[in-house]
Design a protein with these regions (language model features):
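Alpha-helical metal-binding/catalytic segments enriched in His/Glu/Asp
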Residues: 104, 114-126, 130-180, 300
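A non-catalytic alpha/beta surface segment that caps or lines the substrate-entry region
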Residues: 47-107
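Metal-dependent peptidase/peptidase-like ectodomains
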Residues: 164, 174-268, 272-277, 315
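His/Asp/Glu-rich mid-to-C-terminal helical/loop segments that flank catalytic regions of hydrolases
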Residues: 161, 276-322
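Bacterial N-terminal signal peptides
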Residues: 8-18
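Acidic/His- and Gly-rich active-site-bordering loop/insert found
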Residues: 39, 65, 88, 92-132
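Second-shell loop/turn segments in exported
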Residues: 23-25, 42-52, 88-93, 133-145, ...
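N-terminal hydrophobic or amphipathic helices/low-complexity stretches enriched
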Residues: 20-72, 114-115, 317
Length: 322
């Protein structure tokens, strides 16, 4: 009975979101809200790493890429990359694990540049069911990181509805980031393109609220001073500044870091202001600032579009490569 009820909720939410996604604007707030209400709903039970609920999130995200017109780049001609094997965990060391990534591809049109890849990513998992706080035990993960997933979806939608970019753009929703990045570990071991072809990775993490440490319309880039990417994106319209919370070591705390350790210029875009709902049941849709989120996604569209159509290759600052 519980399974049937959950399936009914899933179908109902999916139908609602499909109606919302019929809007034309690439950063339409109804689309953003609909996707957030789906991914961070109580029915998804917090999308715990490696769980059935994470699989539901993956299935939903894959269906959205298909609807948008992004080609599959996962296993066996599909969008899902099944992740299975022995992985490193934050607390338990190495152990067997099963999760999944969602991978889509927008082929570049330029014969000289299409083999260069722009990688846009977010993580779809959160921490699931946990200790009750004020009677609520569902850790919805609206800001962390449903907001990043929706940003990547909206950027994919915009790019897919334009003339194909010169470079190839790959979109990835990683699984099991919260438990140590098992999804990004597997991606690096089984990449859909040669790793050397990935020019840059931008991870989107926690953009659902403004950070009072910077201006209201600004986002920040982890590891800003480690490469020339941030200043270049800012020059092309991104409202990006350096991470105002260096003591938090955010550069090392998201999927981008695993790629950076492989030499890929990889950073995370965020506006996390250290709010107290982090990893709490209160990180829910009710606390998302949708005006900010819409503006944040829109502010990155032009710079990402430029990056996908330029021949610019970011480089690490001497001595700052991980």
């Amino acid at each position: 009975m519980a399974t049937r009820i959950k399936l009914s909720l899933f179908i109902g939410l999916f139908c609602f979101l499909s109606l919302a996604s019929a809007q034309k604007s690439s950063t339409d707030q109804a689309q953003i809200r609909g996707a957030m209400e789906f991914l961070a709903s109580d029915a998804m039970q917090g999308r715990a790493s490696g769980s059935h609920d994470e699989l539901l999130a993956a299935t939903y995200l894959a269906s959205q890429l298909r609807e948008i017109g992004i080609a599959p780049a996962g296993d066996a001609g599909g969008y899902i990359q099944d992740v299975s094997g022995e992985f490193n965990f934050y607390r338990e060391g190495k152990k067997q694990w099963n999760t999944r990534n969602v991978v889509g591809r927008l082929e570049g049109r330029d014969e000289k540049l299409k083999d260069q890849v722009i990688l846009l990513t977010a993580h779809m998992d959160h921490i699931g069911i946990g200790k009750p706080v004020n009677g609520d035990n569902i850790y919805n993960g609206a800001d962390d990181d449903a907001s990043g997933c929706v940003a990547v979806l909206q950027l994919a939608r915009a790019l897919a509805h334009e003339k194909a970019p010169k470079r190839t753009v790959i979109f990835v929703f990683f699984g099991s980031e919260e438990t140590g990045g098992q999804g990004d570990q597997y991606f690096l071991q089984h990449p859909p393109v040669p790793l050397k072809s990935i020019v840059v990775n931008l991870e989107f993490e926690m953009i659902g609220r403004a950070d009072s440490a910077v201006k209201p319309d600004e986002l920040w880039l982890t590891g800003f001073d480690r490469s020339n990417l941030g200043p270049k994106l800012a020059k092309h319209g991104a409202h990006l500044v350096a991470d105002p919370h260096p003591k938090q070591s955010f550069f090392q705390r998201s999927d981008n870091y695993a790629l950076a350790k492989q030499g890929i210029v990889a950073h995370t875009v965020s506006s996390f202001g250290l709010h107290t709902d982090y990893h709490q049941p209160s990180d829910d849709v009710a606390h998302i600032d949708f005006d900010h989120m819409e503006q944040a996604i829109h502010s990155m569209l032009g710079p990402v579009r430029w990056l996908a159509n330029s021949d610019f290759k970011p480089v690490w600052v001497e001595g700052k490569k991980p």
